[in-house]
Curated annotation (Swiss-Prot):
Keywords: Acyltransferase, Cytoplasm, Lipid A biosynthesis, Lipid biosynthesis, Lipid metabolism, Repeat, Transferase. One of its GO terms (molecular function) is acyl-[acyl-carrier-protein]-UDP-N-acetylglucosamine O-acyltransferase activity. Belongs to the transferase hexapeptide repeat family. LpxA subfamily. The gene is lpxA. InterPro entries: Acetyltransf_C (IPR029098), Acetyltransf_C_sf (IPR037157), Hexapep (IPR001451), Hexapep_transf_CS (IPR018357), Lipid_A_LpxA (IPR010137), Trimer_LpxA-like_sf (IPR011004). Involved in the biosynthesis of lipid A, a phosphorylated glycolipid that anchors the lipopolysaccharide to the outer membrane of the cell. Gene3D superfamilies: Hexapeptide repeat proteins, Udp N-acetylglucosamine O-acyltransferase, C-terminal domain. It is an enzyme of class 2 (transferase). It comes from the Bacteria. This is Acyl-[acyl-carrier-protein]--UDP-N-acetylglucosamine O-acyltransferase. Homotrimer. GO terms for cellular component: cytoplasm; membrane. It catalyses: a (3R)-hydroxyacyl-[ACP] + UDP-N-acetyl-alpha-D-glucosamine = a UDP-3-O-[(3R)-3-hydroxyacyl]-N-acetyl-alpha-D-glucosamine + holo-[ACP]. Pathway: Glycolipid biosynthesis; lipid IV(A) biosynthesis; lipid IV(A) from (3R)-3-hydroxytetradecanoyl-[acyl-carrier-protein] and UDP-N-acetyl-alpha-D-glucosamine: step 1/6.
Length: 262
């Protein structure tokens, strides 16, 4: 079903069954598969392929040569009807690839709202990207990676399968990340190591001085003491009772399966 207000270039191919919403623009030489649903106000500029069971929300901007919802690269994948779900107001730049999920990984690659994926970035099967994240040029996420809100991944970085990156993390360019990265941390290197709290990013997002002070203290407990994480966790839980932003640390450590960067 194609909304009457949608604008589709004569050279674009929209397969029968696709749902094209109000005021959608589909530019030259795009290919839209039969199981694709594109929401109100989304713009596909040109030469874009959207395939599989793919849902794209409202007011997204998608640039040339992006590939969304294509079959993933997991060797176990055998054409099962898995999905790609994308929220609203995302900017997906040139040559970005976003692959559909796998049955073993939950069946969905899921992206939230207000994200920016720069040129040549790759999002593999079963990834979960929440809101307001940035992938710089050539950043690569392996399968099953999760990015919490406000994560910035520097250019040419790569994140290992199943890694979780906490909210407000900033990863420097060229980082190789093989373990979970706690919230609020800056990290860089091969393999990535922590080098402080993302203070400037937190200030821009309205964190007040007492909260920043509490986050710094927790960072010092984790990274600048001789105690193990199990030993410092009760202390962090006490701080979290007084400051809800610290509860991110507690929740993160309890769900971590790969261990945290050191």
């Amino acid at each position: 079903m194609i909304h009457p207000s949608a604008k589709i270039h004569p050279t674009a191919i929209v397969e029968e069954g696709a749902k094209i919403g109000e005021n959608v623009i589909i530019g030259p030489f795009c290919l839209i598969g039969a199981d694709v649903d594109i929401g109100k106000g989304t713009v596909l500029h040109s030469h874009i392929v959207v395939k599989g069971i793919t849902r794209i929300g409202e007011d997204n901007q998608i640039y040339q040569f992006a590939s969304i919802g294509e079959a993933n690269q997991d060797l176990k994948y055998n054409g099962e009807p898995t999905k790609t779900i994308i929220g609203d107001r995302n900017r997906i730049r040139e040559s970005v690839t976003i692959h559909r999920g796998t049955v073993q990984g939950g069946g969905v690659t899921r992206i939230g709202d207000d994200n920016l994926f720069m040129i040549n970035s790759h999002i593999a099967h079963d990834c979960i990207i929440k809101n307001r994240c940035i992938l710089a040029n050539n950043a690569t996420l392996a399968g099953h990676v999760q990015l919490d809100d406000f994560v910035i991944v520097g250019g040419m970085s790569a994140i290992h399968q199943f890694v979780v990156v906490g909210a407000h993390v900033m990863l420097g360019g060229g980082s190789m990340v093989s373990q979970d990265v706690p919230p609020y941390v800056m990290a860089q290197g091969n393999h990535a190591r922590p080098f402080g709290v993302n203070i400037e990013g937190l200030k821009r997002r309205g964190f007040d001085k007492p909260t920043l002070h509490a986050i710094r203290n927790v960072y010092k407990l984790i990274y600048r003491s001789d105690k193990t994480l199990d030993e410092v966790l009760p202390e962090i839980e006490q701080v979290a009772q007084k400051d809800s932003s610290i509860s991110f640390f507690v929740e993160f450590f309890k769900r971590s399966t790969r261990g945290i960067i050191r």
